[in-house]
């Protein structure tokens, strides 16, 4: 089974990064939880993945996947995004160098660039997902 290796950088602090290895069959929901956990944040806010990375136009992205798409039954208005619970990593990232913007917490706007940097084969001795590398100290999620 193939694993995907990602480099995730804080958008406005590119020197702070995490490398994560995860199965391509994992949902975007699970991936979001792993990213947030790798930065020691609480996984307690809405989030989305967007194909538009530059500027503040990510909501106009051609491809977008948001938690709100999975909350239609709870009275949440449709955003035109696809599901994060039903979409697999392998459906979004196809080639090394593919990038998406990850927005966590629509109030505080934590932005991350998520770039596929490689593929690897599953190692039965390793538990996945795996944080492969941490560079830089993660900021505090809340400035209390």
Regions found by a protein language model. Give the residues of each.
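Short linear regulatory motifs enriched in tryptophan with gly/pro/ser
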Residues: 1-144
């Amino acid at each position: 089974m193939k694993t995907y290796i990602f480099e995730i950088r804080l958008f406005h602090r590119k020197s702070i990064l995490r490398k994560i290895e995860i199965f391509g069959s994992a949902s975007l929901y699970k991936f979001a939880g792993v990213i947030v956990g790798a930065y020691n944040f609480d996984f307690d806010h809405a989030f989305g993945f967007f194909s538009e990375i530059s500027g503040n136009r990510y909501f106009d992205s051609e491809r977008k996947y948001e938690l709100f798409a999975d909350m239609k039954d709870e009275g949440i208005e449709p955003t035109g995004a696809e599901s994060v619970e039903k979409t697999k990593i392998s459906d979004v990232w196809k080639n090394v160098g593919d990038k998406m913007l990850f927005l966590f917490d629509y109030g505080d706007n934590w932005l991350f660039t998520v770039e596929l940097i490689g593929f690897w084969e599953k190692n039965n001795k390793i538990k996945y997902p795996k944080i492969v590398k941490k560079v830089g100290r993660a900021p505090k999620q809340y400035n209390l």
